[in-house]
């Protein structure tokens, strides 16, 4: 598991990080449903829009598996979360943001 990897590193060398598991601290913004603007996220999939990882302020897309939908539905906007996730795409096609697949999530103070 990678710790301390920045989103900027993923964007700079996306192939190096694809498939890697990492731990990130993020700020939750909203739960969204994927559309055509995010082709790296399966159409209709639930994902989190988040900022980070701390101390960065760029956006990250966190794809949520069905088993975790109830957990993320209870998150308050701007909550600090720590996730373990697998890198799907280090730099998304249109917007350039990392896309990761959620494995675990904890709310942090």
Predicted regions and their residues:
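OB-fold and OB-like single-stranded nucleic-acid-recognition modules
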Residues: 1-109
């Amino acid at each position: 598991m990678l710790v301390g990897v920045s989103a900027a590193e993923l964007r700079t060398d996306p192939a190096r990080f694809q498939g890697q598991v990492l731990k990130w601290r993020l700020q939750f913004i909203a739960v969204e449903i994927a559309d055509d603007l995010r082709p790296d996220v399966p159409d209709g999939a639930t994902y989190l829009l988040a900022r980070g990882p701390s101390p960065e302020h760029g956006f990250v897309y966190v794809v949520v598996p069905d088993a975790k939908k109830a957990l993320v539905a209870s998150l308050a906007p701007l909550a600090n979360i720590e996730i373990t996730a697998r890198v799907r795409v280090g730099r998304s096609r249109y917007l350039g943001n990392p896309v990761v697949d959620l494995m675990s999530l904890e709310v942090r103070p």
